[in-house]
């Protein structure tokens, strides 16, 4: 019998092993869709971004008007711009659900896959930050100034580092040009890192909701999960299209419709909604260096998850006490997101400090101690 081409061709057999004949646990459900949704988001962002880059001008005197030109004069430019801006929000919605699922079902015990995933999160955040500067509106300019200025908190090299990133003594033309360069190249680095992420995942196979070994009960990825993922694509792309056409500016900041002016500070400088939880943690510490370290640690704490897992059970499905504190962490992160969007005054600062303390308390102390407690209660 002639060999099947998808199993014998050097290139097709890699695709076949990753997306067609891949043995997958039979009990995966909707929470496992978000990895593929992130792939769709990345492709959508690269495609819309390439078309926008054809018409965008990375110059302080032309950037804002080039965005207006895209929206007014370019054929379907308004749609491209709205899809790209709101696509970033959907990207972060999917990435946070993906991380949440990993925390809930113990996916972080696949250490290499998890660590590459956290690096990917940093890359996506960096891409979103430099991208937000490109329209050169008020919030773009002041957001770039405030966030890059945080690097001056680094001992000895801080002020030199900031000027090196700015390309001068303030956020100006050189800054915008290099930020555009980074925004263009980073998605391709993310795509390469995503392939490494998948490579490590396929070494171990996917986890499943029970956290048990699923080698006895596996099905091929296609057609079962490929169609399930396709259903997710339709829902997400439908939601993205609806938001981009009916309420395109819902998640944006009104200040960004004003051209950047270094002489006028906006009344309340804040990043996009997906960074607000980290911004609230940064703002909750009065010391500049302490705030920057807390900001970094709020994401880097994810690297510790495989180390601080003390439970003999993998998934939270069978851990009622730890499950309660997982949802407390989700609620706490939602409170931090709300606080990050509020003015820097009481009672918001106090609430932010309490929520920031709880955030680190859950990660650093409660997760390992609850694992040990449950082992003792279950006598395992």
UniProtKB/Swiss-Prot annotation:
Entry's Gene Ontology BP terms: mitochondrial electron transport, ubiquinol to cytochrome c
Protein residues bound to heme b b562: 84, 183
CC per GO annotation: mitochondrial inner membrane; respiratory chain complex III
Subcellular location: Mitochondrion inner membrane
Cofactor binding note of this UniProt entry: Binds 2 heme b groups non-covalently.
Residue sites binding a ubiquinone per the record: 202
Signal peptide from the UniProt entry: none
Keyword Heme: yes
Keywords: Electron transport, Heme, Iron, Membrane, Metal-binding, Mitochondrion, Mitochondrion inner membrane, Respiratory chain, Transmembrane, Transmembrane helix, Transport, Ubiquinone
Pfam family, one: Cytochrom_B_C
Family recorded in the similarity comment: Belongs to the cytochrome b family.
Role, per record: Component of the ubiquinol-cytochrome c reductase complex (complex III or cytochrome b-c1 complex) that is part of the mitochondrial respiratory chain. The b-c1 complex mediates electron transfer from ubiquinol to cytochrome c. Contributes to the generation of a proton gradient across the mitochondrial membrane that is then used for ATP synthesis.
Subunit structure of this chain's protein: The cytochrome bc1 complex contains 3 respiratory subunits (MT-CYB, CYC1 and UQCRFS1), 2 core proteins (UQCRC1 and UQCRC2) and probably 6 low-molecular weight proteins.
Protein name (record): Cytochrome b
Annotated source species: Aquarana catesbeiana
């Amino acid at each position: 019998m002639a060999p099947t081409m998808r199993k014998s061709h050097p290139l097709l057999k890699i695709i076949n092993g990753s997306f067609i004949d891949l043995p997958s646990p039979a009990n995966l459900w909707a929470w496992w869709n978000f990895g593929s949704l992130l792939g769709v988001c990345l492709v959508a962002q690269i495609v819309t971004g390439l078309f926008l880059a054809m018409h965008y001008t990375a110059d302080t005197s032309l950037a804002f008007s080039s965005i207006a030109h895209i929206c007014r004069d370019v054929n379907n430019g308004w749609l491209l711009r709205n899809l790209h801006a709101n696509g970033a929000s959907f990207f972060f919605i999917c990435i946070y659900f993906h991380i949440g699922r990993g925390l809930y079902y113990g996916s972080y015990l696949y250490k290499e896959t998890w660590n590459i995933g956290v690096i990917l999160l940093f890359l996506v955040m960096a891409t979103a930050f430099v991208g937000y500067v490109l329209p050169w509106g008020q919030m773009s300019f002041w957001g770039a100034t405030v966030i890059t200025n945080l690097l001056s908190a680094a001992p000895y090299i801080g002020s030199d580092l900031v000027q090196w990133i700015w390309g001068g003594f303030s956020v100006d033309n050189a800054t915008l040009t290099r930020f555009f360069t980074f925004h263009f190249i980073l998605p391709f680095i993310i795509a390469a890192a995503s392939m490494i992420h998948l490579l490590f995942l396929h070494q171990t196979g996917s986890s499943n909701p029970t956290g048990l070994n699923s080698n006895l009960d596996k099905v091929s990825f296609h057609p079962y999960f490929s169609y399930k993922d396709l259903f997710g694509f339709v829902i997400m792309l439908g939601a993205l299209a609806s938001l981009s056409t009916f309420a395109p500016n819902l998640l944006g900041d009104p200040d960004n419709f004003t051209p950047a002016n270094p002489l006028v500070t906006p009344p309340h400088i804040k990043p996009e909604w997906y960074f607000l939880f980290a911004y609230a943690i940064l703002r909750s510490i009065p010391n500049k260096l302490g705030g920057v370290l807390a900001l970094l640690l709020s994401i880097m704490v994810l690297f510790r998850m495989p180390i601080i897992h003390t439970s003999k059970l993998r998934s939270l499905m069978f851990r009622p006490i730890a499950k309660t504190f997982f949802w407390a962490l989700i609620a706490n992160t939602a409170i931090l997101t709300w606080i990050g969007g509020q003015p820097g005054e009481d009672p918001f600062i106090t609430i932010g400090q309490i929520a920031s303390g709880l955030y680190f308390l859950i990660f650093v102390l409660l997760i390992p101690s609850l694992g040990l407690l449950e082992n003792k209660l279950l006598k395992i």
